[in-house]
Regions:
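Beta-strand-rich structural segments
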Residues: 120-124, 215-232
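Short, solvent-exposed loop/linker segments at the N-terminal edge
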Residues: 109-116, 207-218
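Short, well-ordered beta-strand segments
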Residues: 136-141, 236-246
Length: 246
């Protein structure tokens, strides 16, 4: 991998997650340190694809390659949503994503992190993004505002990185609004994690009906949550699982 932080584990903190995203933005804008890392900035290139989508076990070494936008179990990192913001807001894929999107790339977890204080990242393919903390507007930015920094990406249909400065830290909710033609069309919120309360089990189907004959394998996620249902990203809790049946 190339760039500031090409590899990041899912359990690393929110700043490290952002560093992987920022490295990919630098490659698109021509600030990568290899010639081919000028994908959108190079007028001869009309598109790009990502290697690798997921983290994977390396055949030559024991260490896992953590360069994916999802982990080995296909659970999304922040960079997954960064890549999702590059698609046109008019494009939908039933069961996977719907048109306009916005994502707050922060856990709002600590005043020690720039991603919860002075550089709160938001990914969106909308015309304008507004960010609120506990109901108060932090700021709003448009695609047009970002053309100086991300002009090459925007000109080819992609989306910029929106960074908001809250001036400090406050526990609670960060809420982003995606605006198209002056109307809020999509929102995303994150809350400061509190004490562990319960385990939520998620079985993503991806529109696949699994058959218990050994031919299908799907991930099952056990997520440690607080009383509000907020995922506790840095939980070190041990979970015992008993499975029965054939």
């Amino acid at each position: 991998g190339v760039g500031e932080k090409p590899r990041v584990r899912l359990d690393e903190d929110e700043v490290e997650q952002l560093r992987q995203c920022r490295g990919r933005f630098q490659q698109l804008t021509g600030k990568g340190y290899f010639d081919w890392c000028m994908l959108d900035a190079n007028p001869r290139m009309g598109g790009h694809f990502l290697w690798s989508y997921n983290d994977y076990n390396r055949g030559a070494e024991e260490e896992t390659m953590f360069c994916g936008v999802v982990d080995v179990n296909r659970y999304p990192k922040f960079s997954y949503y960064m890549m999702q913001s590059m698609r046109p807001k008019e494009v939908s894929q039933p069961g996977l994503y719907q048109g306009p999107m916005v994502f707050v790339a922060s856990f709002n977890s600590s005043g020690d992190y720039i991603t919860s204080t002075t550089d709160i990242p938001v990914f969106s393919n909308c015309d304008e993004v507004r960010l609120y903390r506990n109901g108060r507007l932090i700021g709003k930015q448009t695609r047009e505002d970002q053309k100086k920094e991300y002009g090459a990406i925007i000109e080819k249909g992609g989306s910029p990185l929106y960074l908001f400065n809250a001036g400090g830290y406050e526990q609670g909710e960060l809420k982003a609004e995606g605006v198209v033609n002056g109307k809020v069309v999509v929102t995303h919120s994150v809350r400061t994690p509190e004490k562990p309360h319960h385990v939520r089990i998620v079985v993503p189907s991806h529109q696949v009906r699994p058959v218990a004959d050994g031919s299908d394998m799907i991930p099952v996620y056990f997520i440690v949550c607080d009383a509000n249902g907020t995922r506790i990203n840095d939980s070190k809790a041990e979970i015992t699982i008993d499975v029965s049946g054939e």
